[in-house]
């Protein structure tokens, strides 16, 4: 029951396509609709961040057997954009990686500064890898997947 799909993310239309395909992949593997929706939200947030902050990137979706016999779905967002300056701050709602977001700038930013926090709340695991050539954000889902806890 393994599967992998990779989507280039360069434009806003890619965000919608990737979100739809993530939900579809989850449902094809028996994930309940609500949990599949949470996977789609995570993919949407990560893909949106690639478009907003990255130079170019991709979303990879992996489905594999978990150690407990259930499924594990992993979302890997990779880009060659700038590093996240302060990850702990970026995870706070209403903040970017430099600090609180000025409410007067919300409309031009295209977001409320809740994306990474939402990813952390919805996924069962979150890892951020930053290197000189870019970064990867890895969100893992196992809770609520077929055969899992």
Model-derived regions: residue spans:
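Conserved ATP-binding N-box helix of the HATPase_c
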Residues: 33-60
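A general secondary-structure signal for short beta-strands and their flanking turns/coil
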Residues: 2, 54, 70-72, 134
